[in-house]
A protein has these predicted regions:
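N-terminal accessory/pre-domain segments preceding catalytic cores
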Residues: 32-150
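Hydrophobic/aromatic-rich core segments of domains that either
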Residues: 1-32
């Protein structure tokens, strides 16, 4: 893509969650060597795939190299944008294990995700619950998927 090589494994993007809910996933779209190696053990790297510019999460603005509380406004905007576009599933990718763990700690473990939802209310007229949501963690790919209750 645009002169760079990427890995795309559409066979691993299972659209069914653990709860049985169907959702389209983009976990394995346009990955570099490091990203694909996190989950694909018996995998031969035939091309030098170092670029990340066309990675799904980077292209959609849902990639966080690092995470801290200052990112809550950005996250509220991401959620509001998804709701405005008729969706309710937000997939976030973090740039490292440390960033992922910090996001889980800040958002999930402390419950600040509900503060983000309340802040999202100010950014959209779409009705949704600020008291209930589902989330799925993928520590192998550093992903956090949010499912907003409408």
């Amino acid at each position: 893509i645009n002169g760079d090589f990427y890995y795309l494994d559409c066979t691993w993007d299972d659209p069914v969650s653990k709860s049985g809910e169907e959702m389209v996933m983009y976990s394995y779209f346009n990955l570099n060597n490091e990203m694909i190696a996190a989950t694909h053990r018996d995998f031969s790297i035939d091309f030098d795939c170092e670029a990340t510019a066309e990675n799904y999460y980077i292209k959609t603005g849902t990639y966080f190299e690092n995470y801290d509380r200052s990112d809550e406004k950005k996250l509220a905007s991401i959620i509001a944008n998804e709701l405005e576009n008729g969706g309710n599933v937000i997939q976030l990718r973090f740039g490292s294990k440390a960033a992922y763990k910090e996001a889980i700690s800040e958002l999930v473990d402390t419950g600040r995700l509900y503060n983000v939802l309340r802040n999202t209310k100010e950014k959209t007229k779409v009705k949704f619950s600020t008291d209930s949501l589902s989330y799925y963690k993928d520590s192998g790919q550093y992903l956090l998927t949010l499912v907003i209750e409408k």
